[in-house]
From Swiss-Prot:
HAMAP family reported for this sequence: 6P_gluconolactonase
EC number, UniProt record: 3.1.1.31
Function: Catalyzes the hydrolysis of 6-phosphogluconolactone to 6-phosphogluconate.
Gene: pgl
Record protein name field: 6-phosphogluconolactonase
Organism, as annotated: Yersinia enterocolitica serotype O:8 / biotype 1B (strain NCTC 13174 / 8081)
Pathway: Carbohydrate degradation; pentose phosphate pathway; D-ribulose 5-phosphate from D-glucose 6-phosphate (oxidative stage): step 2/3
Group of enzyme by EC: hydrolase
Signal peptide start-end: none
Length: 333
């Protein structure tokens, strides 16, 4: 089966389902009407369920993924706050939801049918948590809290309970505003994009995954950029050679090369993209990048140069209104 791309458009309450061809072309498979403004999405590690966060009736809609990638609704569960970012643990047993405006993170069990259930825990008084990211050991949840300039760390128990990690947090530069994260495939390095100054922090992971330390910070914007920074998303290629971020003010993608050990990044350049790129993603083969324009109502596909990481525009496609999230299903054997 070919890869399948899901694009969430909250303003029209739709998910567009596309098949991704081997040369980067997209073929529309399905348009799903969602019961609410669909925002964050995540795919179960077993690749058979898609989860989407909706508002104004805060909740998670679970979808079954058919063999061709199309979706069928399987259930809905409530959330304590408006979902800003969602993710699962690596075994697909629990779903985490970060709520920026409600200052909380919740954890919900996923049943044996792949359907998200009512939350079993809620962590409150987190200053504007913008994402919830499980680490490569499946034991630590990292939560960038934008308004306190810290990334909080929590231990995840086998029963799905979160408690503060021994290293409770990592402090970033004042006013940076940590937002989204990505992990290097070697599992020894993590990256966090900072919304308010459009920089990237590189984290060294040590002590068997137990300790995090910032070892590099790099500006992602052009040297002559003088407007307000407004970074959004971050992703790394599967081979760990190139890292990308999006900035919504400039409507561009920042391109970084990554050292072999992942510990050092270098700014390669920029590529203009769709207006206000809230979300983008990279296919599982590392060949294509797909960016969504929250203000353009389009997505655009780019080919990734395997040596330089630079992008070549292939084609843009109309989607729903206000697209802001892109998830990509891995090809099934």
């Amino acid at each position: 089966m070919k890869q399948v791309v899901y694009v969430a458009s909250p303003d029209s309450q739709q998910i567009h389902v596309w098949q991704l061809g081997s040369t980067g072309e997209l073929t529309l498979l399905q348009t799903v009407e969602v019961p609410g403004q669909v925002q964050p999405m995540t795919i179960n590690p077993n690749q058979r369920h898609l989860y989407v966060g909706v508002r104004p009736d805060f909740g998670i809609v679970s979808y079954n993924i058919a063999d061709d990638g199309t979706l069928t609704a399987a259930g809905m569960a409530p959330l304590p706050g408006s979902p800003t970012h969602i993710g699962t643990d690596l075994q697909g047993r629990f779903l985490f939801s970060a709520s920026y405006s409600f200052n909380c993170v919740s954890i919900s069990p996923i049943d044996e049918h792949g359907v998200v259930q009512t939350p079993i825990q809620q962590l409150n008084d987190l200053p504007a948590p913008h994402s919830a990211n499980i680490d490569p050991t499946n034991q630590i949840l990292l939560v960038p809290c934008l308004k306190e300039d810290k990334v909080r760390l929590f231990d995840l128990s086998a029963e799905g309970k979160l408690t503060p990690h021994a290293q409770s947090d990592v402090t970033v530069a004042a006013g940076a505003g940590p937002r989204h994260m990505a992990f290097h495939p070697n599992q020894q390095v993590a990256y966090c994009v900072n919304e308010l100054n459009s920089s990237v922090d590189v984290y060294q992971i040590s002590n068997n995954g137990q300790e995090y330390k910032i070892i590099q910070t790099l500006d992602a914007m052009p040297a002559d950029f003088t407007d307000t920074c407004w970074a959004a998303d971050i992703h790394i290629t599967p081979n760990g050679r190139h890292l990308y971020i999006s900035d919504r003010t400039a409507s561009l993608l920042g391109i970084f090369s990554v050292s072999e050990d992942g510990r050092e990044i270098a700014l390669v350049g920029h590529h203009q993209t769709e207006a206000q790129p809230r979300g983008f993603n990279i296919d599982h083969n590392g060949q294509f990048l797909i960016s969504s324009g929250q203000k353009s109502d389009h997505i655009e596909v780019y080919r990734i140069d395997q040596i330089s990481g630079e992008l070549t525009t292939l084609k843009r496609y109309p989607v729903g209104k206000g697209p802001m999230w892109v998830s990509i299903l891995a090809p099934r054997a």
